[in-house]
Amino acid sequence: MSKKRNNPETIAIHGGDYRSDPATNAVAVPIYRTTSYQFQGTEHAANLFALKEFGNIYTRIMNPTNDVLEKRVAALEGGLSCVTVSSGQTASSFAVLNVAQSGDNIVSSTDLYGGTVSLFTHTLSKLGIEIRYADPSDPKNFEKAIDDKTRAFYGETLPNPYLRVFPIKEVSDIGRKYNIPLIMDNTAAPVICLLYTSPSPRD
């Protein structure tokens, strides 16, 4: 029998592994407004920077407040982990740049938020990443657009402004066939549309 998933409201408040502040035992998550952290010594610092040991190095890399947020968002979405960034366009950029480089291409849905179209057209193109567009009304259009340089499919769950539901399963099945990941912008339906089934599928 599978373990019952907590309600989203419970996960939002208690998700992740945070229970209380180790210094004060306060149950509310503190807002750490620091940029730097004190090391226990030179060996401790060296281990952190060499990534031999997990811990706080610099707030742009890791912050205890962000850590709690990321674990809770991952729990809400049913994902394995999460990275918080300052905007949706940053998230889209990170996702694409994680898998593609100059000379590669991404096959994207034609139904896209205007800001994403600008990102793809004016920014990623300058980095040598080609964006090919496929009409999602027929998922086979994604398969027709790929070649050996295709590094990802891209779509929006409920695209702005059309709100035509993206065929997630059909396109992800094509991606599995060719070992191409599907990057989804889930801005319009977070928590409601769970794109991952592990580690905690919604009942």
Q: Where are the predicted features?
A:
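Hydrophobic beta-strand scaffold residues
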Residues: 131, 182-183
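Conserved N-terminal alpha-helix of the aminotransferase class I/II PLP-enzyme fold
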Residues: 36, 41-90, 115-122
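Conserved PLP-anchoring active-site segment centered on the Schiff-base-forming lysine
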Residues: 98-116, 134-135
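Active-site core of PLP-dependent enzymes with the aminotransferase class I/II
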Residues: 158-181, 188-194
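Short conserved active-site loop signatures built around small residues
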Residues: 2-31
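Buried hydrophobic positions in well-ordered alpha/beta secondary-structure cores of metabolic enzymes
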Residues: 25, 73, 91, 106, ...
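Conserved small/polar residues in nucleotide/adenosyl-binding loops
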Residues: 196-203
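PLP-dependent aminotransferase-class I/II
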Residues: 118-170
